[in-house]
Amino acid sequence: MEAHHVKSLLAVLSLIALPVMAAEPTLYGRYEYIALPEIGGQVLKAKMDTGALTASLSARDIETFKRDGEDWVRFRLGTKDASNQVYEHKIARISKIKTRSEEDEDDNEVAAPTKRPVVDLELCLGNVKRTVEVNLTDRSSFNYPLLIGAKALREFGAAVNPARRFTADKPDC
């Protein structure tokens, strides 16, 4: 009878451990390829940045407008090889971003945070697709047109190994 109780206890414990094991994050490198199904299926090199809160996509000609009483944004992809295709998305919210220069303690000048439109955008990393909040800004002076911040990393159940690069396969969603 005691062996039966031990087996039952082990069975219950293994069931309890399953969600914990399933919650183990997927390990990605500091840089990964990410597809944007809603932006013409573009595949971009992205920087996985745990120090940034939100994701940012390089965009140009960013223009907000009203459609049926709701706030929308129209933009072009801001990458070297981008076409002139115009994309339109409903605005999820407006983010207020502090730039590094605004965080400089030696600078006594108080600057207003930059306001950026945020859209809900489908991203594909490896074979995982998630909808995440992405703010639109001109990142043309940066090496990577897409920055994936901590919120999006959580959506993907991701952890980042900064010593690795491009660990996921090319996007396949």
Language-model segments: which ranges?
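Bacterial N-terminal signal peptides that target proteins for export
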Residues: 1-10
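Hydrophobic helical h-region of N-terminal Sec-dependent signal peptides
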Residues: 11-15
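Pepsin/retropepsin-fold aspartyl endopeptidases
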Residues: 22-173
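N-terminal signal peptide c-region/cleavage motif recognized by signal peptidases
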Residues: 17-19
